[in-house]
């Protein structure tokens, strides 16, 4: 009895692996049937559902399952089957058991293979290779899939094609060869425009913007963005990426107000699961707000899952808020590698001027009269002639309206004027107006994002028309009954 129990325990892991793989294979067959039906009825929503279901199975894909699925979906010995099978690794003993178990229930492939199913096979193999971090094989597989896509012009493939474009760019980015495919992406975007493939245009435009920004080609990115056709967004994820890239371009072009709006909108619209993307949006939004002279709320830095990633930017914000130039230098040197990795170091260099302005504003509020050497000392200016630099900084701040003061050149001091009542100015009105405009824009976006049932725009049937219709139906039924009686 004991030996029997032990034998059952030993076989349990193997049986669980087989049952798990068999269920995954069964799910893939159902997805293939869904794609086949969508191809026949030309329903894009079925193809989109198949892609969503595949993402859910992503972690369960193995080499043996993929090999069995390729045998099921593609004609053995065909060009696509031979090419894709070369990318799938051969399994071990358990995998062979799974192959045998799945092949017992395997149906013979149809004689007519839909192009959607073939492209889907490319997609699922590419997804597996990227998850296994086999980027060189993924490059070859994605290049073959793009070559196959160029010969297919069907709108039911657009959903799968957009995913292939994304992973095509990702595989080249991971191997450091992103510049090689820029021409191909431009040609694909041109083809998608001619074919009215709006989802493909969205995806390819974002990939091209990412390609340009990866190599700091901001001018080329802006030229492409401004000339590319725009339309209503089809994918929320692609629209969020577009807003993020637009915010980065606007930031480099010193258009901080537009950049702030784009970055905050991207962070707000992004899915909750996209934590890394929301962190990147918040990093750039924090820097843009600092460059605008604003201090972000503390709650931004304490969002769930973001505390550690935003810690360097929290300390940077604290240095800017205090106006301590020495603390700003310390934070900049402490997190130099982090800022370089985030590619935000150039923006942080711009913040030095804001730190000085903030420190000078604090001095102006605290002192009605202070000598320029003391100003240089409090600002911690470590130049060869700090007094002359302090005088120049104060003069520029007065000219720009950052402080309300005058310079007494004879005595070498800064004289601050009395602080007026801010509520007697237009600043509160401007602040409230910006908040109201933000709420109205959010309401309008929420209304546009609503989904309404079909035929809601049609007028409802009136009572008179309803009575006429029912009367006609009754007369027709009575007439048909009389005809049946005549037959008897």
Swiss-Prot record:
Q: Which molecular function GO terms apply here? A: enzyme regulator activity
State the phenotype upon gene disruption: Short pollen tube growth and failure to exit the style.
One Gene Ontology term of the biological-process aspect is: regulation of protein catabolic process
- Which residue stretches does the UniProt record annotate as biased composition, category Basic and acidic residues? 456-481
Which family is annotated? Belongs to the proteasome subunit S3 family.
Keywords associated with the record = Proteasome
Instruction: Note the Pfam families from the entry.
Output: PCI, Rpn3_C
Instruction: Write down what this protein is called.
Output: 26S proteasome non-ATPase regulatory subunit 3 homolog A
Cite the Gene3D superfamilies for this sequence: 1.25.40.570
**Coiled-coil residue spans:** none
Q: Where is this region: Disordered?
A: 451-488
What is the superkingdom listed in this entry's lineage? Answer: Eukaryota
This molecule's function is given as:
Acts as a regulatory subunit of the 26 proteasome which is involved in the ATP-dependent degradation of ubiquitinated proteins.
GO cellular component annotations of the record? cytosol; nucleus; plasmodesma; proteasome complex
Which InterPro entries does the record associate with it? 26S_Psome_reg_C, CSN3, PCI_dom, WH_DNA-bd_sf
Q: Where does tissue-level expression of this protein occur?
A: Ubiquitous with highest expression in flowers.
Q: Where is the PCI domain?
A: 240-421
Per the UniProt record, the source organism is Arabidopsis thaliana
Name the SUPFAM superfamilies for this protein.
Winged helix' DNA-binding domain (SSF46785)
Assembly and interaction partners: Component of the 19S regulatory particle (RP/PA700) lid subcomplex of the 26S proteasome. The 26S proteasome is composed of a core protease (CP), known as the 20S proteasome, capped at one or both ends by the 19S regulatory particle (RP/PA700). The RP/PA700 complex is composed of at least 17 different subunits in two subcomplexes, the base and the lid, which form the portions proximal and distal to the 20S proteolytic core, respectively. Interacts with UCH1 and UCH2.
């Amino acid at each position: 009895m004991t030996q029997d129990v032990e034998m059952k325990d030993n076989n349990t892991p193997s049986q669980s692996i087989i049952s798990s793989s068999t269920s995954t294979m069964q799910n893939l067959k159902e997805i293939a049937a869904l794609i086949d039906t969508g191809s026949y009825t030309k329903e894009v929503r079925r193809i989109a559902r198949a892609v969503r279901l595949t993402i859910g199975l992503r972690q369960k894909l193995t080499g043996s399952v993929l090999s069995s699925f390729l045998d099921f979906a593609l004609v053995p010995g065909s060009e696509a089957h031979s090419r894709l099978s070369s990318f799938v690794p051969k399994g071990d003993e358990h995998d062979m058991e799974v192959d045998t178990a799945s092949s017992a229930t395997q149906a013979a492939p149809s004689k007519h293979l839909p192009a959607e199913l073939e492209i889907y096979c490319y997609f699922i193999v590419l997804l597996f290779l990227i998850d296994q971090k086999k980027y060189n094989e993924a490059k070859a597989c994605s290049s073959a899939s793009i070559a196959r896509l160029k010969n297919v012009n069907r709108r039911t493939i657009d959903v799968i094609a957009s995913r292939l474009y994304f992973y095509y760019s990702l595989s080249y980015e991971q191997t450091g060869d992103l510049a090689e495919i820029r021409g191909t992406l431009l040609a694909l975007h041109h083809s998608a425009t001619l074919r009215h493939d709006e989802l493909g245009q969205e995806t390819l435009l974002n990939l091209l913007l990412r390609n340009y920004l990866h190599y700091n080609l901001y001018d080329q990115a802006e030229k492409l963005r401004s000339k590319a056709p725009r339309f209503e967004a089809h994918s929320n994820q692609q629209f969020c990426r577009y807003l993020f890239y637009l915010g980065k371009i606007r930031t480099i072009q010193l258009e901080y107000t537009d950049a702030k709006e784009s970055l905050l909108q991207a962070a707000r619209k992004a899915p909750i699961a996209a934590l890394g993307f929301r962190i990147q949006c918040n990093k750039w939004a924090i820097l843009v707000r600092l460059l605008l002279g604003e201090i972000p709320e503390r709650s931004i830095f304490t969002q769930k899952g973001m505390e550690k990633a935003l810690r360097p930017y929290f300390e940077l914000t604290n240095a800017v808020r205090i106006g301590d130039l020495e603390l700003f230098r310390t934070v900049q040197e402490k997190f130099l590698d982090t800022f370089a990795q985030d590619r935000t170091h150039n923006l942080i260099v711009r913040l030095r001027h804001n730190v000085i302005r903030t420190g000078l504003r604090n001095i102006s509020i605290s002192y009605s009269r202070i000598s320029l050497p003391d100003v240089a000392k409090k600002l911690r200016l470590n130049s060869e002639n700090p007094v002359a630099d302090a005088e120049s900084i104060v003069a520029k701040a007065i000219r720009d309206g950052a402080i309300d003061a005058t310079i007494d050149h004879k005595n070498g001091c800064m004289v601050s004027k009395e602080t007026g009542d801010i509520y007697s100015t237009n600043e509160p009105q401007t602040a409230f107006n910006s908040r109201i405009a933000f709420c109205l824009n959010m309401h309008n976006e929420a209304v546009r994002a609503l989904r309404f049932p079909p035929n809601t725009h049609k007028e409802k049937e009136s009572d008179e028309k309803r009575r006429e219709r029912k009367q006609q139906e009754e007369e027709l039924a009575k007439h048909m009954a009389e005809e049946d009686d005549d037959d008897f």
